[in-house]
């Protein structure tokens, strides 16, 4: 069928099942957007290119599908670099389609030219520069395959402007042939037999859940394994929701701001079953001492992650969609016996969990983060998707907000990108229109992409935005308070910005809570809004996130929290 390159892109997106595009137009993609217009293809005009790429990211995380975004050349696609890196660090499947200057202008420092392929090489799974229209169908087919297969990740397709204009006989390939890359990994079953044998020999096992369980959609299979073995569970930030937070022996998040029970379980276990996690430094603390008493079994699809940071005694390298069903099958005959074998250990870790709840305090004239999270939780459905920005509120959400389903907790874990949350929540809502979507943000993070408030209003996207307002960059402020002699350099925001007024000006119904006694009534009104809504809630400006493992310390060298910042058993339970 004869068509131009721009039309070929739209037809290819349809064949790949793409439902919506996030983007921002410009000179090199005008022909592409003209085809979007003629086709009436669903697209969202964001307020900034970073909003577009984070929107595609949130869509991908919530749905499990490939997110797609468009940008023009030069500053347009350069504005997406942070979002591409965010997706790369968290293994999120994206296809980023950017315009490039015309082929005869490439390499001449032309107007709005940037070598985006070179810029993004370290932060994409693969990228392409398309200078021949006949290559476009193959490249797009490969891009979607690479993005979603194996360990997912972002793929950039940079297309010269004249390629969009050129006409050719379009035919979309049915298969992908990439030499040396299959995208499907089945490991050695003998490694699984070793893992089962280690479980049989263990008396004090712990399961560490990572984001790989979420991205592979194997949470239900893993839940079956957990229920059979009745094994204590700890989670990474990215793995939150893979096992319901309400599971009896779920000890919470591990690592820098993990629970005492989770961190002490890792320190005291004799077997660590780590599934779909890459042992990030925020999880391990001092990696040389991480789970030092334990035999470590590491399940991961990416061979590069095996033994990269933490040495594993048994490594099961392969797709979790292959390995976890086999594991479930292999423990069927021994699971009940093993559950009994682990009974004393379960009791021990549960007692620690009860004795050392996450720290929280009630301060006059302010709403505590714990109270806010719990009151929000009461008002939303179990199926609600929670997004966060980055900072203290992110950790409080991980500690105090119970998530019971996979793909229902969206956060920037690897890169820690402030400004991620609002556009990601927008993308999640568009991908999952039947679900409630709630964003937790801080008064620092929300400013970074607040222009997307207008996008919510323009498209009537009913995200509910909860901003914890303390007038400071909370996590930076906390570190300065604890480790830099209270030198609050460049971390105090002040009280001049009225973000409720900003939201109102952008067409979003806004609320504010300055008196803690008003919280419940205002939250009721907030959640009753039909459409997007914004609420900012005053929290203590000097509140710290505890527990905390200082950088470079061992997991059992936690500051648990208290009025004097010393170890204490006071506080309020996380769950």
Protein language model features and the residues they cover:
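Catalytic phosphate/nucleotide-handling subdomain of diverse soluble enzymes
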Residues: 420-464, 468
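Secondary-structure transition/capping motifs at alpha-helix termini
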Residues: 39, 228, 382-383, 403-407, ...
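Active-site diphosphate/adenylate-binding microenvironment
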Residues: 6-9, 14, 32-34, 347-428
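Phosphate/pyrophosphate-binding active-site segments
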Residues: 134, 293-390, 516, 523, ...
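N-terminal alpha/beta PP-like core and its mobile active-site loop of ThDP/TPP-dependent enzymes
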Residues: 1-340, 355, 375, 379-382, ...
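Glycine-rich phosphate/pyrophosphate-binding beta-alpha loops
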Residues: 26-29, 74, 91, 154, ...
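Hydrophobic, well-ordered secondary-structure elements that form the walls
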Residues: 296, 376, 388, 427, ...
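Thiamine diphosphate
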Residues: 112, 268, 458-551
